[in-house]
Amino acid sequence: MPKTMGILGKNIGMTRVYGEVGQAIPVTVVQAGPCKVLQVKTNATDGYNAVQVGFENKKSSRVNKAEAGHFAKSDSEGFYFVREFRVVDPATYNVGDMISVDALFKAGDIVDVQGTSKGRGFQGVIKRWGFKGGPGGHGSKHHRAPGSIGCSAYPGRVVKGKKMPGRMGNDTVLKKNVTVVDVRIDENVVLLKGPMPGAKNGLLKIYSK
């Protein structure tokens, strides 16, 4: 992962905006922050440099005692999402600081976005890997089967990494070099060019570059 500061956000959905000469630009609307610094980790105390942030407030009645003690250090009730950003110099941040979208990004910036792809469940090789499949008719009984998965006497086994049916999606995906189309400070919204990983209301980590 990039060793830069970033912000947490929620994937609201997609829409389009229009550029200066009228071109339609597909964008993903992300509710980005505000995030609160919960902990600052350093090489001396934790073995690595990082800034831990919380996003989306949670009622104190929904927080267990261990979480409540941790959140109390930053004078917070609670957060639904707690994540870390690896940074080179954590000394620039203090516990309790608020991180807003306009402090990190502006229109035209290039960022990296991390999310969790949509889970598709157990899928076959055609949907999962794009296999061509077998013959469509004429007595064929393996329209969507993978076909042979190995060799004969040598090596006499299925090789590691063979593409086969299995669980598809629900993976961590990092999309690099995404353009920030617009930042709307009053709404804590950032518009990112193109689609982002994951479903609506999914959590996104946006890294500055």
From Swiss-Prot:
The answer to whether UniProt assigns keyword Disulfide bond to this entry is no
Q: Which GO terms describe its molecular function?
A: rRNA binding; structural constituent of ribosome
GO terms for biological process, alphabetical: translation
The record ties this protein, via Gene3D superfamilies, to: 3.30.160.810, Translation factors (2.40.30.10)
PROSITE patterns per UniProt = RIBOSOMAL_L3
Query: Which SUPFAM superfamilies did the record assign?
Result: Translation proteins
Q: Which domain of life is it from?
A: Bacteria
List keywords of the entry alphabetically.
Ribonucleoprotein, Ribosomal protein, RNA-binding, rRNA-binding
* InterPro entries, per database record: Ribosomal_uL3 (IPR000597), Ribosomal_uL3_bac/org-type (IPR019927), Ribosomal_uL3_CS (IPR019926), Transl_B-barrel_sf (IPR009000)
Keyword check for RNA-binding:
yes
Any S-S bridges, and between which cysteines? none
> What family does the database annotate?
Belongs to the universal ribosomal protein uL3 family.
Q: What is this protein's function?
A: One of the primary rRNA binding proteins, it binds directly near the 3'-end of the 23S rRNA, where it nucleates assembly of the 50S subunit.
Binding partners and assembly? Part of the 50S ribosomal subunit. Forms a cluster with proteins L14 and L19.
**Protein's recorded name:** Large ribosomal subunit protein uL3
